[in-house]
Amino acid sequence: MGNFLLVHGAWCGGWVWRKVADRLRSFGHNVYTPSLSGMGDRSHLLSANISLQTHIEDIFNIVEFERLTNVVLVAHSYGGMVATGVADRIPDKIDALIYLNAALPQNGQAMLDLISDKRKNTVIRLAEQEGAGVGIPSSLIMETGIEDDREHAEFMSRTCLCL
């Protein structure tokens, strides 16, 4: 079956893919849902040294160390930045690249280049005020798309600073 590598977005971790991963596994696929450095269950690693390049390396290493080929790389939100970098680095190992409400950068663009100047200024200000200049606080989450109140509360309780 297929090798699915699911890349989460900002403020969360690999846990966000649990239901999707369970469903894909029920069809016999191999599914990987890593948390990016400094996020999710790896939030204790958050530091000023973590960057988009670190996150690209996180996902690249999954492909390399698991010796994956024919990968279906699925990205959500900020994960689109990461997946784009990975796909550029190892295009021969990626069968499909799926952007699920994800950032779709052009070469050389940063995440902040994809948002309005007003939002960019807010992000920078809050990162300095609430994120010690290192991370972006989850107070910036505008919409989760989760309609069930209990699931929304569960999601928000697990959010963390992101880069």
Give residue ranges: language-model regions:
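Structural signature of beta-strand start/N-cap positions in the alpha/beta core
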Residues: 3, 30, 70, 93-96
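Glycine-rich His-Gly loop
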Residues: 7-10, 76-77, 102
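Active-site loop/oxyanion-hole signature of alpha/beta-hydrolase fold enzymes
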Residues: 30-32, 38-72, 88-89, 112-116
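Flexible "cap/lid" loop of the alpha/beta hydrolase fold
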Residues: 88-138
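Conserved alpha/beta-hydrolase catalytic His-Asp/Glu region
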Residues: 131-163
